[in-house]
Curated annotation (Swiss-Prot):
Listed pathway(s): Carbohydrate degradation; glycolysis; pyruvate from D-glyceraldehyde 3-phosphate: step 4/5
Coiled coil location: none
Origin species: Corynebacterium efficiens (strain DSM 44549 / YS-314 / AJ 12310 / JCM 11189 / NBRC 100395)
A GO biological-process term: glycolytic process
Positions with a binding annotation for Mg(2+): 241, 282, 309
Gene Ontology molecular function terms on file: magnesium ion binding; phosphopyruvate hydratase activity
Protein name: Enolase
Gene: eno
Major localization listed first in the record, in broad terms: cytoplasm
Classification of source organism: Bacteria, Bacillati, Actinomycetota, Actinomycetes, Mycobacteriales
Length: 425
């Protein structure tokens, strides 16, 4: 296999106008890979450390230190290593960093190189990235979890829940599911307009109307699904990313004008699941509320996917504890939460072996990089969350999945309803 010859990084811009790291890896056979690193708005306290410069430049958000760490340390460490040994390469960067959360070199520096190495190795092997990572059995296209109403930390809409998503489950192909999602998105704009509400967009391309409650937002989406000619629950289901750590203060959940305990929030979710065709609820409780997650999973986990994002932070150690305690039943997969592809692979593998589902995910600050689209297919996630069918930073991932589906031809299988085995709607 080709050896790593040169590693280089630069500072580029993300979709929120903030700097991020882009890494390039060149191999001795002329192959090369490039990768841009995403960044989140609502970040878990247990995430790998994103290194920022501080100071006045870019309001403290510059990443020149991370870029320097790639160009002056990581590149020298990896020179001469075989590019197809992803585990060895990632382990070398983790060892070089020397901290538990990648805070010395920066997870943004390490991840950029980790992804670029995989792309360079795929280029050298003459394979698309999904095939290089996933092997011959990578053929399942994920359900697009399309965030069409933005709230919480992603918008100024006033609603506490961060994301209201649609899941087009009743279709035979990814391309048809994407079409249906886009049609609902456009129908939703009309519904919002007709009610005299704002059609301004949040960070992830979803609308950010000022609505009074979670139910009001869900009602808008159900109306849009019907307006587009689809049946809620049969053709298109609903999903939530509550991001509840964002409104957890002083031991209480400050939700929709009241202060609630974990038990009370669990009852709120149970009622919503009974009233609406909801297949998935992400981060329903604060990220360290282990007892609450265990109780919630026991209460409604047999009929809805309970996803750990801030709760698990794509970390195999936290996931292992969750599996042992039967806390949640699904993991959100964000490569920059853990900082290397290898650790991401390990988390997804652990989840699937335990019967947990997995959802590949973008961040609210994205680039045109499409790595997560390939990863969703390679790792057989069955679900991908990468925003509304709007804004090029989101649509880039959907377009890559369309290319993958076309490349697979008759071998392509759309996950559809099978991605949500607990859903009875």
């Amino acid at each position: 296999m080709a050896e790593i010859m040169h590693v280089f990084a630069r500072e580029i811009m993300d979709s929120r106008g903030n700097p991020t790291v882009e890494a390039e890896v060149f191999l001795d056979d002329g192959s090369h890979g490039v990768a841009g690193v995403p960044s989140g708005a609502s970040t878990g306290v247990h995430e790998a450390h994103e290194l920022r410069d501080g100071g006045d430049r870019y309001l403290g958000k510059g990443v020149l230190k991370a870029v320097e760490n790639v160009n002056e340390e990581i590149g020298d460490e990896l020179a001469g290593l075989e590019a197809d040994d992803q585990r060895l390469i990632d382990a070398a960067m983790i060892k070089l960093d020397g901290t538990e959360n990648k805070s010395r070199l920066g997870a943004n520096a390490i991840l950029g190189v980790s992804m670029a190495v995989a792309k360079a190795a795929a280029d050298s092997a003459g394979l698309p990235l999904f095939r290089y990572i996933g092997g011959p059995n990578a053929h399942v296209l994920p359900v697009p979890m399309m965030n069409i109403i933005n709230g919480g930390a992603h918008a100024d809409s006033g609603v506490d829940v961060q994301e209201f998503m649609i899941a087009p489950i009743g279709f035979d192909s990814f391309s048809e599911a994407l079409r249906a999602g886009a049609e609902v998105y456009h129908a939703l704009k009309k519904v919002i307009n007709e009610k005299g509400l704002s059609t301004g967009l949040g960070d992830e391309g979803g609308f950010a109307p000022s609505v009074e409650s979670t139910r009001a937002a869900l009602d808008l989406i159900v109306e849009a699904i019907k307006k587009a000619g689809f049946e809620p629950g049969k053709d298109i289901a609903l999903a939530l990313d509550v991001a509840s750590s964002e409104f957890f203060k002083d031991g209480k959940y400050h939700f929709e004008g009241g202060e609630h305990t974990a038990e009370e929030m669990a009852n709120v979710y149970a009622e919503l699941v009974d009233e609406y065709p909801i297949v998935s609820i992400e981060d329903p409780l604060q990220e360290d509320d282990w007892d609450g997650y265990v109780a919630l999973t026991a209460q409604i986990g047999d009929k809805v996917q309970i996803v750990g994002d801030d709760f698990f932070v794509t970390n195999p150690a936290r996931l292992k504890e969750g599996i042992a305690k039967k806390a949640a039943n699904s993991i959100l997969v964000k490569v920059n939460q853990i900082g290397t592809l290898t650790e991401t692979f390990d988390a997804v593998d652990m989840a699937h072996r335990a019967g947990y589902t997995s959802m590949m995910s973008h961040r609210s600050g994205e680039t045109e990089d499409t790595t997560i689209a390939d990863l969703a297919v390679a790792l057989n996630c069955g679900q991908i969350k990468t925003g509304a069918p709007a804004r090029s930073d989101r649509v880039a991932k959907y377009n890559q999945l369309l290319r993958i589906e076309q490349l697979l031809g008759d071998a392509a299988v759309y996950a559809g309803r099978s991605a949500f085995p607990r859903f009875q709607g």
